[in-house]
Amino acid sequence: MATIEGTFEKSSSLKVAIVIARFNDLITNKLLSGCLDCLSRHGIDVSESSNQIDVAWVPGSFELPIISQELARTGKYEVLITLGAVIRGDTPHFDVVVSEASKGIATVSRETGVPIIFGVLTTDTMQQALERAGIKNNLGWSYALQALEMGSLMKAVT
């Protein structure tokens, strides 16, 4: 029986794109910071002149799938990370945005064969979002780890 797993040792050569929503940027900027910190500590060049990582900003989480699709189709990236924060309000808008963003991102990943990490916080309150973006822990770090693992796993199976 073969066991195939992603590793973190062989991930320093990965090419990564991060697609990040501007809406709720108090949260998404913190997620980006955690994400870049993790990638850097695992050997990815995150400097301004890096050819290993690109960051694309979109207006909100609803727009994450379309830009993820275009970036994945370029063939330049081995893994994408989407970052967003959707906080429940008094209208059904939350449900629509979360549903379409998650379905769209999953569809793009399946159709292109490029792993896309779903780093969209979906919380009931701003406090919950802040806790997940740095007050208690920074899930941006976790999303980057998932990207490293999936990027190396895809190399192992292809």
UniProtKB/Swiss-Prot annotation:
Gene3D superfamilies: Lumazine/riboflavin synthase (3.40.50.960). GO terms for biological process: riboflavin biosynthetic process. Belongs to the DMRL synthase family. This is 6,7-dimethyl-8-ribityllumazine synthase. Its EC number is 2.5.1.78. Keywords: Riboflavin biosynthesis, Transferase. The keyword Transmembrane helix does not apply.
